[in-house]
């Protein structure tokens, strides 16, 4: 497999794997705008030259849009290989490229979000364990921080206190999200519309800065849905899934 690094220079012409429509699609435009602002902060987006979901996205942990203390580490935003790309070792290729790059940049190791059992839009814990990762912290909602250290003397990454006990003091449905995931540009407005039509208390909070992301009340900032103050899910949903959740 041949891979290419997406940069500010080729961003407009390259597809971004998780959303492969044209640049006018709101999902693509929102993701590319978010990426463009992150490249100067050290973000790397490495993908297959072929169209499809086969890529890794990572950034120095100090600049990551998650509430973690992991100074000197590299944080993996997303490692996604699916469809016909699965089963060929491409996930290992991408992770190995990240490891090599991170070592060359003097990073202490890698960290990434997962859970004890595979959850949608999170890394596969079996794959992480196979690759030498271990759990270094866990929030009350079961979201875990995994790490792979290059230095046995390095401090382990950990969640910030604000994220260890996911809870908010607000009734109704409250959704925290960022533009890191392109699907949000399409589906968050759908949920807002559905909630309004069905007289459901719903508020979407768009996290638009690294500082706000790093102080969020949830270990996951891409998409975190709360109901009456309690964390519910990180799984993006359409109108049907949302109404199924509401109706129990």
What are these language model-derived features?
Residues 140-165:
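C-terminal "cap" of GNAT-fold acetyltransferases
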Residues 47, 51-62, 75, 80:
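Conserved beta-strand in the GNAT
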Residues 113, 132-146, 232-235:
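Conserved catalytic-core motifs of GNAT/GCN5-like acyltransferases
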Residues 81, 87-102:
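Conserved acetyl-CoA-binding loop-helix of GNAT-fold acetyltransferases
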